[in-house]
Amino acid sequence: MKLSRRQFGMTIGAGAIAAAYGRPGWAQQPIIIKYSHVVANDTPKGKGALKFKELAEKYTNGKVKVEVYPNSTLYKDKEEIEALQLGSVQMLGPSTAKFAPLGAKEFEALDLPWLFKDDETYGSAMKGPLGTWLFKKLESKGILGLAYWDNGFHMVSANKPLINPSDFQGLKIRISGSKIADRYFRDMGSIPQIMAFSEVYQALQTGVVDGCENTPSNYFTQKFHEVQKDITVSYHAHLQYAVIVNAKFWKALPADVRGQAEKAMNEATDYTNSIAQKENEEALAEIKKSGKTTLHYLTDAQKVAWQNAMHPTYAWAKSRVGGEVLDLIAKELNVKMN
């Protein structure tokens, strides 16, 4: 029987575990978990990945070795999910919008503007039936979801102040790929541009794109604020990550090792989500202190104008993500999704 590339990668991953445990001296050959992500080590996700490494290696007494590859050093964000499915990497932490190309468009509902009022509301929602239901959408793709990690709320920037919806007219704004984000920026009159995270700084610097949206920690660690004259602290949409693993690899782990790794992940998740807000506040303070950009804050009336401009995205979203996930969100948040 000829194996596909995906089957081959998964077989190799599971086989490596069996080999490590099936021969004398396996302790000298720890199980390797490669964790690839696209942001810096000193962001909430970066620190969370390092915390998982620390705890997983501690709890398994060295039976597991976690190799963390930040800043797209192993795979770019548009490559990493296929690499996970092929078994070339075992763990990722992509933004949830990255699952739409797999057929799991429902995750994009989390990108709706003004959906979560704060980090606590987001965290509570994802710990409930909504988070479980969404992860089940990945199982048929050979992927298991382990945790949701918070990264705070988006700001948006350009080389001019973005105060009123009309200020967005004709601007090329980089987005990560979410069709929901694409829609709400189009509702504001801009032209969304999908681009790998590792390419954004140069694109901003050279004018390939006019602006972008992201969280304060990502702006600061990637130095986006150094090549954007103005940033609006709008907090118009939430950015969340899902920590996922190659299902065959994870299920092939010995039960005791898997349990210890899951304990490490649970604790790393609590840690990551507990520091996200503080990390973003500190990053925003550093951006302000740098003097390299001007920060703008919306008045209540200006915020309402943005909300009204982006509101058509909600009606459109039902055709994109389906009514079931919107109903789940409405129930979880006790809000009307219209």
Residue map of PLM features:
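N-terminal secretory/targeting leader peptides
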Residues: K2-A19, R23-T121, P129-T132, K136-N338
